[in-house]
Curated annotation (Swiss-Prot):
ATP binds at residue 333. The gene is metG. Homodimer. This is Methionine--tRNA ligase. It is an enzyme of class 6 (ligase). Zn(2+) binds at residues 142, 145, 155, 158. HAMAP family: Met_tRNA_synth_type1. Binds 1 zinc ion per subunit. It holds the Pfam family tRNA_bind. GO terms for biological process: methionyl-tRNA aminoacylation. It comes from the Bacteria. It comes from Francisella tularensis subsp. holarctica (strain FTNF002-00 / FTA).
Amino acid sequence: MRKILVTNALPYANGDLHLGHMLGYIQSDIWVRFQKLQGNQCIFVCGSDTHGTPIMLKAKSLGITPEELVTKYSNRHLQDFTDFEINFDNYHSTHNSLNKEIVEDIYNKLNNKNLISKKAIAQAYDPEAKMFLPDRFVKGTCPKCKAEDQYGDSCEVCGATYDPTELINPRSVISGQSPIQKNSEHFFFDLPALEKNIKDWIESNTLLQPEVANKLAEWFEQGLQSWDISRDAPYFGFAIPGTNEQKFFYVWLDAPMGYIASFKDYCNKNNINFGDFWGDSSSESELYHFIGKDIIYFHALFWPAILSSTGYKTPTSVFANGFLTVNGKKMSKSRGTFIQARTYLDNLEPSYLRYYFASRLTSRIDDIDLNLEEFVTKSNSDIVGKVVNIASRCAGFIYKKFDATLSGEIFDPELESEFSKNHDAITQAFEKREFAHAVRLIMALADKANQFIDYHKPWQLAKEEGQEQKVHQVCSQGINMFKVLIAYLKPIIPSIVAEAERFLNIQFISWADAPKFLINHKIDKFKPLATRIEKEKVDKILEDTKKMFENEQAPQSKKEEPKLDIAAECTFDDFMKVDLRIAKITEASHVEGADKLLKLILDLGGVTKQVFAGIKSAYKPEDLIGKHTIMVANLAPRKMKFGMSEGMVLAAGDGKGIYILEPHEGAQPGMRVK
């Protein structure tokens, strides 16, 4: 039995949850439920992130205390999680004496190791609001990629981190005024001193997502900087000891420690030894943090550094998920697609969204699109039309004609074996968080079950004299195939499975038993387990969302919707001049002095070409060797200061990532792409 501790990013307690939040929590909940069915001791903790200037200012605007604000939203968050069937073992808060004790203890340990220093720095100060501005209360143009409307600590376009004072054309989010600079003494964590600790953690982490590893390599190349862990009063949070409550711990220092506090609280309530799960690195337990891709910096750099230097186990891995779009676009209040969790729950059952997200989720950090038309179609087709329909087609015959008892024989052992043989592949897919693959395997089995029923037509057999035994066996096999499918789906749609368990008179408590057929087993009367989604329900969600936000103040400047910038039209003859070929990457290496380039040696089926490709931020050289890609083979050679580039590899990009093109299996080096 494995000992596994899972955390999910703490939601910020100054607003309601939306479906973008739910994507990450549903992902982790599915994985945790699967681990528990495997018989592992898996503990799932979370809590509310409750500190910082945004909470302080929002509470002030509402005429309530910050404590009242965070209590209100913490309760609402927990209710949303509960109704979405996110089954935390403990839900805590960062604003309590236990977390304060942990934060101060870790700070003192860091300070005793000379990892904390003080220095005066220029801070953004709002002269109108008469206060220092936290990072997220300054916006401007990114100093690295020049993207506009970026926060004062990091760019959401290029991922760069910086100080608010480095922003181009900065403005205060509070007053809209240009901030001035004032000096203030701040406390810094010496991150560069722990670079080896972080790199050792990365090297030992076999489960780290490639995208995370690549981003970390990029940050190391840029050089680590000491981290400002303090904020000036006024601030809602924990005061730094010895500062007379004039300096406070930055929210991103105490927020991850909320994971420790939540788990300690759980241990205290359940008489569990904290050290068995989160002791030093020698512990045999596993620790996983599920997070959004926008907070990788804090969880994969600062957090392992802090833990490794204060006697705590470092994460076994950090799993990041992408963002959510709706109908191919960023969630929008005006279009009604900025859907809050409660708005969805007021109109639809959580199982449908849990299933849809599972059908799209992989182990990669891909953004997920909630296509509402596809959402309706997939829910109706897969859950209702394929899975639940199997039971509804067979249960009546068993209940009425055979005393609600399944047959003592298996009608089609070969088909039964196929359901059983897929168990290992489905297990591996769940373990590796390849939920979309697991769903595809399960639905392929559902198709086979429905084909079996369609072929034997028990409704016709029931009308034929002497076919009673066959009707019994066919329908029993149908119910058993339904039983296997529903067991495989338990981590994804637990409430529907709970209803199915009542109908089947069993409880799935062991993943190993999922593929086993029931023999001479008595079932209950079948009742509908899921109903079809009507388009009107989805339309109402959009309308409810529009109404919710229609009274909000319109933004100061409206951004244009992104448009597909198609290049000038070319003729077919022009296009045919471009010679695209399959190429195998035989060598890949860094280019000394180049920030973005990798040197590739490409085999075109006997012909070798050298290419310099601007893909360094997305790929490690060793990960590219042996891959096939597509290159422009007849591009005129170009002399660069690093050498001669004899072509170009094809890649796609959206400003956030780079993705080289890979042909399907079977394509060989030198083949022409037409």
